[in-house]
Amino acid sequence: MKLTRHNGRSGKHGTYNPRHNDRRFDVENSEHIDAERARQNVYWDCYRGFTTHDFRENPEQPDFSFEEIERMYYYEHYADHVNAQNARNEKTRHIERNRTVDDLLKNNKTCPEESIYQIGTMEESVPPETLALIVSEFYEEFENRFGSHIHILDWALHLDEGTPHISRKRRWRNWVSLSLNRNSQKESTITGNRLLMQSVG
């Protein structure tokens, strides 16, 4: 059976919307989503770990959307760098280069990268538990190879569409910092490539 993986950051309507992955929209009016089966979806994020639809409905549990999770992560890890870069821009009288953390989330070069994993087709696929196990082992190997240079922000096991699949958002930890420094783009590319080579080697 074929394993399919698709990576991307944006489509024709802009950067991928995290609300699609954690189903923070009216699924009743979506043609390709079964609203009843949507309650079986499993979600994970880097701050709380695993959650489900029932977890969301529990008033005693903190409920954060993937959109909020990704925003929190970006503010926690990149706000200081954004502010420092903006200060340098102002010092050199290039305030037109200033950005906000929210700008990073909306930009298709600095937003989280999304990967979709699927085994099989609508006609034939593996049980959701098998898919989750295989992808978990893949994540573990990914972590062993790239370590702290990459960070998984959130993922969802979708059981409410034609074929079970996992949608995951990740962030190359140093890539946003490198992308912000426009005055040394060539040096940034060299540094980024060096980081990747160190991770793989």
Residue ranges and their predicted role:
Residues 1-201:
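N-terminal nicking endonuclease/strand-transfer module with a His-rich metal-binding environment
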